[in-house]
Amino acid sequence: MGLTKIIALQVAGDGGFAAAKSAADGAAAAELGECTCMAFFDRQTGRESPAHASECHGDCQVPGYEEYAVNRGATLKVVVNDGAYVFIYRSLGEFAGV
């Protein structure tokens, strides 16, 4: 299916990763209902989840963490502070409330 929506957020202050993740989680829940974060990227530290997902991607257009999430049903990307942080989500769908 692939990503069907991208939301851009600006988070004020210097709350770092925790503040960005909290804001992204809220935006994702408002858009998808019950959902889970399948992947993330932190530009400042170069940290991504799943770890090392982009290492084998070289010059590919799509980062490894994004491809990982999309291939597992993710449909929403939340970009915080102009790409300082990226979080990718999927709805729990039939698993919601279980």
Q: Residues of each region from the PLM?
A:
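Contiguous hydrophobic, core-forming segments of folded domains
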Residues: 1-2
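Short, non-transmembrane alpha-helical segments in secretory-pathway proteins
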Residues: 5-49
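Generic structural motif
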Residues: 12-14, 72, 83
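Exposed beta-strand-loop-beta-strand "reactive/processing" segments of non-cytosolic proteins
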Residues: 39-81
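A short, surface-exposed interaction/processing loop segment used at functional sites
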Residues: 80-98
